């Protein structure tokens, strides 16, 4: 083959076979470059963007339409969700063909439509916008070291547009503007002509055309040489900050940029000097920046995480702002015009011939027969309305001090009113300086000066009312608000209407004010008609004085009824009586209520009375009680606040007042201590009065005696003591009488026995389980008799049941032998005849005894064996020393009990058996032991 290939000359790139290329990427590259030999249609494979086979068999995955032969995404295809609610109704959704197309099919569809690509975008705006949006979309999906959106400067289109390429080929250079040079020159020429025509003088003979022609030549030469260039942005805005290159801090907040720019321009225009900061000082550092964050630490190494928290705070700027404010106030005067020349703005000239004339209109002439129906007078016009004509003008007095005194006094009287003049006249009767008040020296000048001050004050008040107060801005009162809302006004009393009618809209000094401090005619009539203490004239007089001085100027009097002969307690009681009587009179109570309040016979109240402050008292009937006129006055009460137990529990705090009684009311002074007497004295006196008023007939009636059962209140006993203590201690502590005591004792005994039985049963059951013994059930114990029950409790071991049964059988045998002996003694003649029977009986008895002794020996042997086994188990298998001790104690007690039981058995058998039988039994025992 090598020799064959040398004979041929190859031109171009060889076409490769698809079967020879194994790699998918190489195959894709060869297919894209056109170096791959085409196969027939039935052998070709369709692949997607990533080189994956599309139309393959259904059993291997089917149609490749998504994420690695899956549908949609890695998780799979998500169906459309349908949501509809009352607030958000689901609308009719229009379906398009793009909803059912694959990505490859969409690409094929877009290839058929015409759209400007990024390559043919003229200035690259579309490409830049597309790349910026794509970068913002990726920013949300992936984390980034730079937070926020990506700056526009970092995102630039990859390729230049075709328009930029064409402009560069046509001779355009970057940085130059694209416009006609002649257009700008023509515009400048026209503007220069207009400017020169406006400012040329009439007397000048030189025409503006000559000037224009000269400038045209100069500019045309300059324009030919100079090519117009677009001024770069960085020349217009030079860098004056410490930010990074290209960084704009006001990108997302342009309003702050404008504010800063206006502030800087204002500072330049005004021209005031900035205060010397650390940057401009001679002793300041050359860097111009003082490290504000001193707390970072000088010895620590700077790291990425060590950030200066004060780095963004400009200390110099705050220092400048603090010192700028007074400087601005001082420089405001420079902006003012020193002289207005012709009242013309700069850059304009005043017209010599002005056709404008100000047209004025005269006020309308009022006809003579006009009658004014409406008068709009001010609220203070009635007060300041002069009753007499103006006094004549009088020259001031020669004495300068008197003149100053008159002028100052006149202004003060016009401000405060005529009342101050009357008071000054009364107080300064002997002073010669105030003779002008008594028509003396300087009276005419004072009258004239007072009138002038009043007129001046009247004009000022009118002016302020016209300027400030208008019908729409007036302060809304309660009456106007109610009328606007349609509310029904409350009914006023007769007293309020009289006072409002007498006022007349202007302030008047109350003429009846003295009636509250002196005795008026109406109060004298009421005092004569109502005398609650007429039996005691001195007390009645003190009561009247108390009513007069009850509320003097709104304050309670202290020494209203001071009598030297009375004690403190009597005076306090009298004060309380007077208060109660006054309250009863004011509220219009009936005769019985007043009598109950004062605790004295009051036969005076024919009708209710109401005391007022002015002297317009009104007598009302007893049936009608005016609740509005009744006045209640506040009273001070002092008491100790105690928290609720639930509140203390909620806050997890101990109750500080648990088990403590509330304290008695503390006496504030000596009179209160005498007034607040204990209630026991009152109760004792009331009891004595009730006993004296009981008639004698009631004493004869005998009341039936009622037997009261006294409950035995027991002391609280501890739970442990109630369970495990003896009944004798309880009997000593709790003495009882009669049947109740006996019944209680029986109950205690029954409870103690049942409790002991339960405790013993539980203890024995637990002990038997530990030792491996069987414990009899409770039902078996109940079926036995009482002595057996007691013996079972004492001897609770295996084989004990059989021993007790044998004991009972031996007792029955003994009783039968006694009966047979008695029969023998009664019938001595029959002994010979009954020898055979007795011998047979005795032989039967001997056999039974032998069997019993054998069983007894076996039992003893088994008991000894079990005890030895138990002893060995106890020594080897016990877990603690306490259990060993308890088991040894139980063992000893059980051995003692068994030994006693054996003795009782032997004694009983010796009673009912003969000596021979005992001897025989002993012999047999010895033989067995040997």
Curated annotation (Swiss-Prot):
Keywords, in A-Z order: Growth regulation, Isopeptide bond, mRNA processing, Nucleus, RNA-binding, RNA-mediated gene silencing, Ubl conjugation
Domain G-patch: 159-199
Span list, region Disordered: 76-152, 478-508, 687-751, 773-930
Crosslink feature (Glycyl lysine isopeptide (Lys-Gly) (interchain with G-Cter in ubiquitin)) location: 25
Record flagged with keyword Disulfide bond: no
Biased composition (Acidic residues): 701-711
Polar residues bias (residue ranges): 499-508
Sequence ranges of Basic and acidic residues compositional bias: 489-498, 779-808, 858-877, 913-923
Composition-biased stretches (Basic residues): 848-857, 892-908
One Gene Ontology term from the biological process aspect of the record: miRNA processing
Expressed in which tissues: Expressed in vasculature of cotyledons and leaves, young meristematic tissues, trichomes and pistils.
GO molecular function: pre-miRNA binding; primary miRNA binding; RNA binding
SURP motif repeats: 405-447
Localisation per UniProt entry: Nucleus speckle; Nucleus, Nucleoplasm
Disruption phenotype: Developmental defects, elongation defects of all organs, reduced plant height, triple cotyledons phenotype, reduced vascularization and infertility due to failure to produce pollen.
Classification via PROSITE patterns: SURP (PS50128)
Gene Ontology CC annotations of this record: nuclear speck; nucleus
Cited function: Functions as a component of microRNA (miRNA) and small interfering RNA (siRNA) biogenesis. May assist DCL1 and DCL4 to efficiently process and/or recruit the precursors of miRNAs and siRNAs. In the miRNA biogenesis pathway, associates with the DCL1 complex that processes primary miRNAs (pri-miRNAs) into miRNAs. Binds pri-miRNAs and precursor miRNAs (pre-miRNAs). Is required for the interaction between pri-miRNAs and DRB1. Required for general proper plant growth and, in particular, initiation of vascular development.
Record-given protein name: G patch domain-containing protein TGH
UniProt source species: Arabidopsis thaliana
Gene name for this UniProt entry: TGH
């Amino acid at each position: 083959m090598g020799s064959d290939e040398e004979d041929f000359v190859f031109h171009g790139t060889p076409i490769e076979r698809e079967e020879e290329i194994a790699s998918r990427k190489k195959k894709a590259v060869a297919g894209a470059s056109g170096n791959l030999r085409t196969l027939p249609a039935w052998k070709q494979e369709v692949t997607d963007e990533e080189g994956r086979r599309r139309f393959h068999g259904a059993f291997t995955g089917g149609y490749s339409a998504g994420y690695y032969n899956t549908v949609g995404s890695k998780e799979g295809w998500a169906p459309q969700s349908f949501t509809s609610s009352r607030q958000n109704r689901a609308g009719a959704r229009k379906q398009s063909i793009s909803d059912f197309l694959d990505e490859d099919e969409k690409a094929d569809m877009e290839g058929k439509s015409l759209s400007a690509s990024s390559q043919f975008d003229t200035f690259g705006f579309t490409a830049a916008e597309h790349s910026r949006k794509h970068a913002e979309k990726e920013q949300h999906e992936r984390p980034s070291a730079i937070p926020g959106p990506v700056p526009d400067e970092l995102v630039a289109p990859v390729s230049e547009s075709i328009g930029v390429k064409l402009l560069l080929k046509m001779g355009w250079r970057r940085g130059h503007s694209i416009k006609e040079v002649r257009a700008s020159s023509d515009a400048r020429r026209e503007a220069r002509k207009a400017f020169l025509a406006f400012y040329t003088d009439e007397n000048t003979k030189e025409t503006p055309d000559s000037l224009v022609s000269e400038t045209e030549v100069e500019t045309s030469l300059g324009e030919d040489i100079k090519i117009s260039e677009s001024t770069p942005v960085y020349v217009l805005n030079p860098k004056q900050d410490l930010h990074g290159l290209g960084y704009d801090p006001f990108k997302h907040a342009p309003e702050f940029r404008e504010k800063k720019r206006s502030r800087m321009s204002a500072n330049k225009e005004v021209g005031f000097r900035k205060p010397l900061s650390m940057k401009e000082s001679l002793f300041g550092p050359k860097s111009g920046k003082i490290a504000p964050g001193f707390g970072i630490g000088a010895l620590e190494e700077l790291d990425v995480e060590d950030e200066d928290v004060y780095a963004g705070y400009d200390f110099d700027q705050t220092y400048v702002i603090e010192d700028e404010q007074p400087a601005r106030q001082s420089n405001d005067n420079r902006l003012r015009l020193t002289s207005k020349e012709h009242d013309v703005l700069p850059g304009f000239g005043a017209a010599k011939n002005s056709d404008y004339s100000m047209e004025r209109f005269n006020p309308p002439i009022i006809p003579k027969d006009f009658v004014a129906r409406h008068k709009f007078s001010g609220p203070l016009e009635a007060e300041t309305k002069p009753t007499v004509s103006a006094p004549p003008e009088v020259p001031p007095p020669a004495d300068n001090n008197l003149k100053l005194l008159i002028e100052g006094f006149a202004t003060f009287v016009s401000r405060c009113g005529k009342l101050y003049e009357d008071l000054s006249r009364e107080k300064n009767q002997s002073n010669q300086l105030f003779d002008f008040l008594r028509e003396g020296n300087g009276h005419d000048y004072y009258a004239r000066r007072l009138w002038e001050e009043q007129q001046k004050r009247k004009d000022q008040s009118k002016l302020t009312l016209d300027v400030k107060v208008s019908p729409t801005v007036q302060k809304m009162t309660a009456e106007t608000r109610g009328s606007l809302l349609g509310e029904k006004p409350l009914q006023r009393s007769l007293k309020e209407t009289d006072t409002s009618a007498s006022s007349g809209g202007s302030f008047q000094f109350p003429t009846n004010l003295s009636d509250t401090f002196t005795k008026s005619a109406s109060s004298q009539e009421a005092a004569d008609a109502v005398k609650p203490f007429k039996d005691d004239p001195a007390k009645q007089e003190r009561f009247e004085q108390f009513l007069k001085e009850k509320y003097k100027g709104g304050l309670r009097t202290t020494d209203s009824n001071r009598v030297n002969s009375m004690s403190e307690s009597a005076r306090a009681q009298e004060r309380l009586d007077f208060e109660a009587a006054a309250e009863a009179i004011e509220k219009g109570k009936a005769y019985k209520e007043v009598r109950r309040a004062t605790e004295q016979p009051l036969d005076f109240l024919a009708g209710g009375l109401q005391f007022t402050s002015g002297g317009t008292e009104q007598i009302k009937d007893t049936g009608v009680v005016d609740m509005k006129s009744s006045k209640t006055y506040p009273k001070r009460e002092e008491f100790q606040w105690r928290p609720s137990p639930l509140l203390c529990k909620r806050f997890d705090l101990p109750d500080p007042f648990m088990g403590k009684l509330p304290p008695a009311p503390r006496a504030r002074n000596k009179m209160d201590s005498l007034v607040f007497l204990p209630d026991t004295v009152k109760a004792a006196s009331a009891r004595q009065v009730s006993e004296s008023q009981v008639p004698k007939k009631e004493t004869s009636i005998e009341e039936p005696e009622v037997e009261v059962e006294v409950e035995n209140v027991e002391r609280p006993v501890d739970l442990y003591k109630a369970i495990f203590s003896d009944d004798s201690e309880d009997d000593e502590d709790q003495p009882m009488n009669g049947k109740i005591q006996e019944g209680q004792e029986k109950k205690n005994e029954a409870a103690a026995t049942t409790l002991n039985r339960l405790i013993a049963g539980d203890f024995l059951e637990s002990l038997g389980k530990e030792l491996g013994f069987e414990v009899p059930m409770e039902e078996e114990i109940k079926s036995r008799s009482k002595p057996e029950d007691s013996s079972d409790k004492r001897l609770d071991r295996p084989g004990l049941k059989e021993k007790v049964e044998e004991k009972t059988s031996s007792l029955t045998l003994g009783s039968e032998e006694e009966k047979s002996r008695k029969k023998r003694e009664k019938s001595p003649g029959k002994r010979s005849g009954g020898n055979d029977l007795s011998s047979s009986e005795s032989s039967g008895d001997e056999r039974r005894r032998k069997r019993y002794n054998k069983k007894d020996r076996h039992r003893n042997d088994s008991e000894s064996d079990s005890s030895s086994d138990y002893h060995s188990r106890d020594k080897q298998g016990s877990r603690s020393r306490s259990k060993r001790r308890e088991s040894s104690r139980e063992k000893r007690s059980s051995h003692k009990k068994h030994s006693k039981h054996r003795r009782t058995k032997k004694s009983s058998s010796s009673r009912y058996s003969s000596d021979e039988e005992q001897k025989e039994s002993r012999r047999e025992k010895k033989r067995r032991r040997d």
